[in-house]
């Protein structure tokens, strides 16, 4: 009866959504009514909307965006993809992303295979580390890079480790400010 009815369909995990093909499950005339989504993608959109990566440098014609992204699971990957989609900032420079994860090199290769344009849309530096292995000197190197960090997103599934990393980050910023 309802000719305008649409169906939104959750497909998890993100790796399955990437390869999912609606046409394998529905007739062609039904395809316009079906939309698939993923929870990690919704979270990433909301995070970047509420906590824009360029907030500290939004009015600058020179400064560029530099994110620290801890965790390249579904949410981390979705943040990176959303950043690539939106990453056109006032300075005209492509955003730099320092990605920290224990298996980041393989995960990054898989992302680039799935989304080849990523290489041209973001500048990525990978750090093959578990979140618990990150040291003060690592944080200092990222914070005080030639492109200073503008935002950090900590996205591992271990909330205690996430909070410890956040505390380390804040402590290093405060230590530098007091020098």
Predicted segments — roles?
Residues 1-179:
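Cytosolic regulatory regions of ion transport systems
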